[in-house]
């Protein structure tokens, strides 16, 4: 998630991330959270069908992503907690999305994140930007707040596992080493 090619919400999410509705700070995080939640809500029947048939659903960015990215926009910790609870209630309660057995946060060195965000990237997964920049990716300080929220969620939820993707020098581990760590918790 998000599914940029999904009707209605995929288009709205793409437009938001391009900045068509304003800056990251100017669009209320609860409204943005609802866009991402509705995208998952639209995919819920397919996920539930797969699970009912005994299959496995493996997702990149789910409910905790919504919490991290939207709560990072809220300076007041009490308000951020209210937003967190609202997102949980909306996605798992009102929309009845499947609750994961396990969440994994791949905690990468912030220097690696910064260098990746500054580099020119392309590919089909970037088509939604139409040559522009993702407003969530434009601000490294925002990315640091997102990371902090992910880390906090790992402390609060025993089903949310943090995997440190850095070596003893703070550099990014090679993919094989990260995969080995993932296999240990799965």
Positions of PLM-derived features:
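Generic alpha-helical secondary structure signal
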Residues: 8-15, 108, 112, 145
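Conserved phosphate-donor/acceptor-positioning beta-strand/loop module used by diverse small-molecule
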Residues: 59-62, 87, 96-118
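Short beta->alpha linker loops
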Residues: 4, 62, 108, 166-167
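ATP-dependent small-molecule kinase phosphotransfer cores
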Residues: 1-95
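Structural signal for conserved beta-strand scaffold positions within catalytic alpha/beta enzyme cores
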Residues: 2, 105, 162-164
């Amino acid at each position: 998630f998000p599914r940029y090619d999904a009707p209605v919400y995929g288009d709205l999410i793409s437009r938001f991330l391009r900045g068509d509705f304003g800056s990251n700070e100017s669009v209320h995080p609860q409204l943005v959270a609802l866009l991402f939640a509705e995208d998952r809500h639209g995919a819920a029947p397919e996920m539930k069908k797969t699970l009912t048939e005994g299959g496995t659903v493996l997702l990149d960015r789910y409910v905790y992503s919504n919490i991290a990215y939207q709560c990072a926009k809220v300076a007041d910790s009490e308000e951020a907690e209210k937003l967190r609870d609202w997102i949980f209630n909306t996605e798992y309660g009102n929309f009845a999305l499947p609750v994961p057995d396990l969440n994994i946060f791949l905690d990468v060195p912030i220097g690696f994140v910064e260098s990746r965000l500054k580099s020119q990237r392309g590919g089909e997964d970037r088509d939604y930007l139409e040559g522009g920049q993702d407003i969530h990716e434009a601000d490294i300080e925002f990315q640091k707040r997102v990371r902090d929220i992910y880390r906090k969620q790992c402390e609060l939820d025993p089903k949310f596992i943090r995997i440190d993707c850095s070596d003893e020098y703070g550099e990014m581990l090679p993919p094989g080493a990260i995969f080995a760590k993932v296999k240990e918790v799965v």
